[in-house]
Amino acid sequence: MVEAVLRHRRRRAVARTGEAAQRYAALGWPVCPGAYPPGHAHRPSGFPRSCSCDRMGCPAPGSHPVSPAWQNVASADPELVARWWTAMPLANVILPTGRVFDVLDVPAEAGLLAMSSMERSGLRPGPVALSPGDRAYFFVRSRGAPEDENEWWSCHLDCLPEKVADVAGLRWHCRDSYVLAPPSRTADAPQGRWLREPEANPLPDGVPLLEVLADACEQVGYDR
């Protein structure tokens, strides 16, 4: 009986991930399939794994794209997205940043504090998600990704996937980065979830949110 309930929950979780990918695509948000925790049934005896990829000691288990060419693969085409999750129903959902949106990424505690501050001041934050890694993601209007490098302005907060672990406080995911979207999951953490659901409304400018988020990070013990 217990095993039947667990199987039902796993099937429902898988369905929610595919449905979420379709919903993001309908908003015009490019997505691509992500690695996922393989689960006990997929772990050979004596060889525990926390990620579906073949990499030994994966540094970001369940939190990276399936394809190394994710920047070229990502799409908002509903038919393509449906095919991906039909072929890979367990896949997490990866959202590339720097296209439709950027993401301001802070520790969850700082994010909740910042949301309270924004509510008091009347500042609307736009979509906000909690990640399985105990981070809060604030989705904002993208700074863009111009083809001409001379038109690109960098920021000391810019965060690339391979540098995420080096930055404990405020991170700005823009071009060449990505985030794990709800309801994706990792091996030892709860599913990601939305605190403020995405809607078909214009995303907010990120600059007004920066000061509030930076202050919140400082209040909870982070200097960035």
Question: What does each model-found stretch correspond to?
Answer:
Residues 142-224:
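DNA replication initiation modules
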